[in-house]
Amino acid sequence: MFIMRYIGPVCRLCRKEGEKLFLKGDRCTSQKCAILRKNYAPGMHAGKKAFGKQSEFSRQLREKQKAKRIFQVSESQMAKYYTMATKKHGVTGTIFLQYIERRLDNVVYRCGFAKSRRQARIFVSHGLIKVNGKKCTIPSRIVKVEDKISVNRKTKGVKVLEGLEKQKDYSPKWLKTDLAKGEAMVAFMPDKDDMEKSINSQSIVEFYSK
């Protein structure tokens, strides 16, 4: 099934949400960041305040849209992760985020193998990443505990990944990462403190539960 993806200027997405979504790697932490230069929503009515107070539904919708943009996930995938989360024992919001956090493209980004989730998706799609020693080209693959993720150094595009050993390791504790070797392992399931803190998963759960 063909899935539509946003292919326009990603900086517009950050401006629309009114906060940094870190979609462009190093640019997001520089003075060139669109939020710093144009701290207002895009469009012909930019700078004007929204009319009236946001409803509960509007806040839930905005939270869902923000999560989609941060993780570069389609609507059908979001709904799928919610359905999967409701079938598990535990807090639905936490389980929902665990599924998204364990997507291969997100794990590649979290490990520090890519500067953004968008770049991580490209790396996976182009065969630059292995899972348990085998090349994987599916960005949405959900990795499991003890899965090993590594850089496929036999690919022609591996130069993009050179210099990993010079970077600082900012990976979360649930990922045991060796940047010098270009390897990582899922040590355990991510908990609430290790996942994306800018997302209110409860609001997303409430949106889909209606």
Labelled PLM ranges:
Residues G127-K130, K135-T137:
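Glycine- and Gly-Pro-enriched alpha-helical subdomains that act as flexible
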Residues F123-V124, V143:
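Short, well-ordered loop/turn sites that connect or cap secondary structure elements
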Residues K115:
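Conserved, well-structured core segments that form or line functional sites
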Residues M1-C111, I138-K210:
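Ferredoxin-like alpha/beta domains used as RNA- or RNAP-binding modules
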